[in-house]
């Protein structure tokens, strides 16, 4: 009896560990990825530090990345501006911001095998931007029905 109880507890523990592993390994939704890659609420980041977070999801050094110094909620509001065709010439779900925001552009200067050792040049600017927006996925927070999924361009 004691052995069976121990075995069942061990199986339960293993099952719980497997479930937790699967949950923690889930990929972010497109809007969560957008938030990770492009929203930086603080003032200008050091690109070497900020890009470690971005690169963690692919395990590789991203060549170029732009951080918008604004909130996710502010970018969601841009999704309600009039739609236009995206830079690819086919997607009709892009929207221009109404005002300029501070941005930080990170350009790869030294690639490394380990993404945590990549080096970037940091450039700051004030730019307007265009984002592509889609309906939220079931895994997104229900707060916003439409969410940004791609930073299309700066202007």
Swiss-Prot record:
Keywords: Disulfide bond, Endonuclease, Glycoprotein, Hydrolase, Lyase, Nitration, Nuclease, Signal
E.C. designation(s): 4.6.1.18
Signal peptide bounds: 1-25
Organism superkingdom: Eukaryota
Family note: Belongs to the pancreatic ribonuclease family.
PANTHER family (alphabetical): EOSINOPHIL CATIONIC PROTEIN, RIBONUCLEASE
Protein name: Ribonuclease 2B
Gene transcribed to yield this protein: Rnase2b
């Amino acid at each position: 009896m004691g052995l069976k109880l121990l075995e069942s507890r061990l199986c339960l523990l293993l099952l719980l560990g497997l479930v937790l592993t699967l949950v923690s390994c889930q990929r972010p939704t497109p809007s969560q990825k957008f938030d990770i890659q492009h929203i930086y609420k603080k003032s200008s980041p050091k690109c070497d530090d900020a890009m470690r977070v971005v690169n963690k999801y692919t395990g590789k050094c991203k060549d170029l990345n732009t951080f918008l110094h604004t909130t996710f909620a502010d970018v969601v509001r841009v999704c309600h501006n009039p739609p236009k065709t995206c830079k690819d010439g086919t997607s009709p779900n892009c929207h221009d911001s109404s005002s300029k925001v501070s941005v930080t552009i990170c350009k790869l200067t030294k690639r490394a095998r380990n993404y945590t050792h990549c080096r970037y040049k940091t450039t700051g600017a004030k730019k307007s931007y265009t984002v592509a927006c889609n309906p939220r996925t079931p895994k997104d927070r229900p707060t916003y029905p439409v969410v940004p999924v791609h930073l299309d361009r700066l202007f």
